[in-house]
Amino acid sequence: MAAACTRTLGKVGRLVLDTPTCRFTNTAAFVPRTSMRCQGRAYGTGSSGFKSRLLLAAPVRGSGRVLGCAFLLGGGFGLYQTIKLTLQHHLAEKESDASDLDTDLKLTLYQYKTCPFCSKVRAFLDYHRLPYEIVEVNPVMRQEIKWSTYRKVPILMVNGTVQLNDSSVIISALKTYISSKDKKISEILACYPEMKSKNDRGKDVIEFGNKYWVMVHDADADQLYPGKDSRKEEIKWRTWADDWLVHLISPNVYRTPTEALASFDYIVREGKFGSFEGFFAKYFGAAAMWIISKRLKYKHNLQADVRQDLYKAVNDWVAAIGKNKQFMGGDEPNLADLAVFGVLRVMEGLQSFDDMMEHTKVKKWYSRMQKATQHVS
């Protein structure tokens, strides 16, 4: 959760530095997404131990300034080791395997590995066996994309010259290219115009027109969408994945102090912290994420137990597929299948993922999607 941790820990530190005292109470909380463009996450499950729970459950009193410094110090240690671990994983990453498609595209994906939007793009590329290189972006400095005026991930570079932004635009544009075969990527990109505006807080925002549409001729559309409402349903559920499902990930991953600690415990363990560094990174880092994230539950009007929102969303998706189809797309996954799978996949290895598999009907569909998107080695 490097990107979210960076901004969240900074906010917590400044907040606590300006606050006379700070008190923790043992209530559930949720982690905020970072502009909903990239939410990474820390991995790992399992009990954090009785002492761990006591440290978060017990009230903390004292100088707000000292505690704020502790948050920043712990966050800094944790962030450094997280970035180092991410870079180690990146060095071990290989280019994806050969394509089943006759295409001369050279694709480079700039990403955070645990971002659900980046995961969506990888699911699409893997399913279509499109070879691509990965550049893991440093979530703090983002030096890897300093050349880009667009500062969010994923970014996909095509043949080193054409830049595609926004996960849904990337997927729609590439699907158009694969399906039409008579247009250049640069020509297709013009179908998804960038629109700049300001939100109600006066912040600049960027959206993209037509981003859920695959731009093909009628004859190609009939082949691509054989069902009466298949195109409409694909767009509906792709939009749902971006506008609702992705909002449920962070609240469930960091639902309780124990789950937050379990996630940070993984980072500390894999990052080979010293005992002092590990203490601050694990306990203060997890506490910071836990406290700040409380607002997310109210912002998105979630239930007291956010697992129930996740279960309902996933079961709604399975019900929409129906009993007589393997995928939303029928016998093969469509873009909605790939989007939903990409979002849910970032919870793998966490308690929230295990609970979802146990308490919903998604397991069979998810298993089929795993097989469909596997790399060919």
Swiss-Prot record:
Residue intervals annotated with topology Lumenal: 1-65
Residues in GST N-terminal domain copies: 105-182
Sequence intervals crossing the membrane: 66-83
The entry's keywords: Fatty acid biosynthesis, Fatty acid metabolism, Golgi apparatus, Isomerase, Lipid biosynthesis, Lipid metabolism, Membrane, Prostaglandin biosynthesis, Prostaglandin metabolism, Transmembrane, Transmembrane helix
Any single biological process term in GO: prostaglandin biosynthetic process
Top EC category: isomerase
Record-level GO cellular component terms: Golgi membrane; mitochondrion
Top-level taxon of origin: Eukaryota
Tagged with keyword Lipid biosynthesis: yes
UniProt subcellular location: Golgi apparatus membrane
Pathway listed: Lipid metabolism; prostaglandin biosynthesis
EC number: 5.3.99.3
Single GO molecular function: prostaglandin-E synthase activity
Regulation of its activity: Isomerase activity is increased by sulfhydril compounds. Dithiothreitol (DTT) is most effective, followed by glutathione (GSH) and 2-mercaptoethanol.
Topological relation to the membrane, as annotated: Single-pass membrane protein
Binding site for glutathione: 153, 166-167
Catalysed transformations (reactions): prostaglandin H2 = prostaglandin E2; prostaglandin H2 = (12S)-hydroxy-(5Z,8E,10E)-heptadecatrienoate + malonaldehyde
Keyword Membrane annotated: yes
Domain GST C-terminal: residue ranges: 266-377
Family: Belongs to the GST superfamily.
Physiological role: Isomerase that catalyzes the conversion of PGH2 into the more stable prostaglandin E2 (PGE2) (in vitro). The biological function and the GSH-dependent property of PTGES2 is still under debate. In vivo, PTGES2 could form a complex with GSH and heme and would not participate in PGE2 synthesis but would catalyze the degradation of prostaglandin E2 H2 (PGH2) to 12(S)-hydroxy-5(Z),8(E),10(E)-heptadecatrienoic acid (HHT) and malondialdehyde (MDA).
Subunit text: Homodimer.
Record protein name field: Prostaglandin E synthase 2
Organism of provenance: Danio rerio
